[in-house]
Amino acid sequence: MQVLESQKLSGHIRVSGAKNSSLVLMAAALLADRSVFLSNVPLLTDVEVMSKLLVSMGVELRRNKNQLEIMTSGLSLFSKDLSCEAFHSLRASFFCIGPLLARFGEAKIPLPGGCRIGARPIDEHIQALKALGARVEIQNDYVVAKAISPQKRLIGARIRFNCKSVGATETILMAATLSQGTTILENTAEEPEIQDLATMLNEMGAKIQGAGTSQITIEGVDRLKGCSYTVMPDRIEAGTFLVAAAITRSPLTISPVVPEHLEAVILKLQECGCLIEYSGNTLSVIPRKNLQAVDITTRPFPGFPTDLQAPFMALMTTVKGISKIQETVFENRMQHVGELQRMGATIVLEGNTAVVIGGNNLKATSVTGGDLRSCAAMVLASLAANGTSVIQGLEHLDRGYEDFAEKLNAVGANISRTHSVPLSSQE
């Protein structure tokens, strides 16, 4: 990708459906005994990989652009046509273990993968599945789980997570919907994607209360039906475009968004000196020319999202002053620091804390995005750099941003790609 310095952006950017919601909702569809219709599903390589994984389990999929019909009548326990590598490439593939275990009383799923941004163990998932009455073992790179009750059903339980894990909360939330009795989950993650999942499951006939808080109660039911559901807007994509406006000192409007999902980001941008106005599901951002350096510490929702740490660091390199950026969610999420330094940024890295001495003019060069969000940060930094930058590692970008370059070009950026990963709009 070649990115030319953008003096000013102006206009409106449409936010796609949430990647992280889409993936878990696709897995949740496995719980239904009828078709599930999802709309606002983004065209992303992660979604395509997840689609192929579901098809390999006997699921029939029909896609028309951003709409997806998932039919589970042919669902089988084990993937027959896809290698473990396909599962390893997508961490969200592990979401399938909960629905399979809930419906069939057993499941066999390869160990998950995803971006290399530190250890994201599945210990919490496994311990919670055991608490629901499953025997869980790791055999030759597979997680094998079986319900041990005579009825081959999971049994409701009170489970307290050791940490606020989004993946574990979602996995056990799905598994418990078809369990016998009531499950109470404590110290649960509170991310909006969990609320999105619970809302769809309730429309399918589940009985879930408390999603979005630190305690969720699930009353098990005998079956879940199909439904039609619209994926919520992607809060991380929206936040990325807010940072794009700030880093280029440009006015932009962004929609659709759920402002409550972005409160921590909006507060930090306002602290920087950006004027942000609300109108329904639309945000308008008008940055001041002279922004101020601010500190951030990543936290689980409702704190500042780790997925926007890299884009925000790129912004801080363009602001005069010293900012301290602390990463507390993942232990290996500073891969972008070296690339920003190659562009002329002054950053001192001490473990998971970066001290950014901002105000230097970034210079265009060749950089590589090592993961999804650092790749987005490289694009944003290049918009503010003098000259033309070349960005490698676009396979990461295509995992989580739909039409990223096209959306930015529509508001005045000058970005060209020499190669793109083809995404089929119909299947």
Swiss-Prot record:
Compartments, as annotated in UniProt: Cytoplasm
Pathway(s) per entry: Cell wall biogenesis; peptidoglycan biosynthesis
Domain of life: Bacteria
GO annotation terms (biological process): cell division; cell wall organization; peptidoglycan biosynthetic process; regulation of cell shape; UDP-N-acetylgalactosamine biosynthetic process
An annotated Gene Ontology molecular function: UDP-N-acetylglucosamine 1-carboxyvinyltransferase activity
Swiss-Prot/TrEMBL keywords: Cell cycle, Cell division, Cell shape, Cell wall biogenesis/degradation, Cytoplasm, Peptidoglycan synthesis, Pyruvate, Transferase
One Pfam family recorded for the sequence: EPSP_synthase
A cellular component annotation (GO) from this entry: cytoplasm
Annotated EC: 2.5.1.7
Gene3D superfamilies for the chain: Enolpyruvate transferase domain (3.65.10.10)
Catalytic reaction list: phosphoenolpyruvate + UDP-N-acetyl-alpha-D-glucosamine = UDP-N-acetyl-3-O-(1-carboxyvinyl)-alpha-D-glucosamine + phosphate
Binding site for phosphoenolpyruvate: K19, N20
Similarity comment: family membership: Belongs to the EPSP synthase family. MurA subfamily.
UniProt function note: Cell wall formation. Adds enolpyruvyl to UDP-N-acetylglucosamine.
Name of the protein in question: UDP-N-acetylglucosamine 1-carboxyvinyltransferase 2
Name of the gene: murA2
